[in-house]
């Protein structure tokens, strides 16, 4: 892989459904916190930067990662969405030119192998970005991948913004992206929050690229467990069955 890689890990959320006093990303899976698992996977990609976005109980998260000297932090004090979280990383990305891989701190089983394929999907096609997708039986809550007649991406639409026809789509956005750094810095400020949640969505960056006729590559994975997030204690217990 020719271009340098910077990794952004989104870890600022409260995780209300965990019903716990500690931040969601500090819950442990087989003895290792969720955020540490994502950092260790990122390291396997030989990335130049690992930027972790923190917010809720930020000092606790920061302290837990004190031994990870290669990790820098960006602060998202207000939870205004994933695009807003990435915007908080602009200072950390100063003078960086390459691919930015965006991960979630609560998706602990993603593998470096899958991420390498996603990066190659962008690099090999000359696309501005690549998006990880998957076909799942129960797509409730996930953003949908809407393709055009030729099979290319038309748009990504959040579940709450989908019409009845779009809700029947089973191909979902896994929330993992590779984006050219120049495009990231240019398009993040263009994102609005005219949606059901009133938030700044990262998928809208992808949609803006498509609207401007730039190529976005879709990489579909069959490793469904790898893209499973932790939003509750029940989901955490479920992932215990699959983790090493």
Residue ranges and their predicted role:
Residues 7-9, 51-52, 101-102, 129-132, ...:
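Structural beta-sheet core signal
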Residues 2-3, 32-103, 109-113:
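Conserved N-terminal catalytic core of the sugar/cofactor nucleotidyltransferase
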Residues 69, 110-196, 205, 214, ...:
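Conserved core of the sugar-phosphate nucleotidyltransferase
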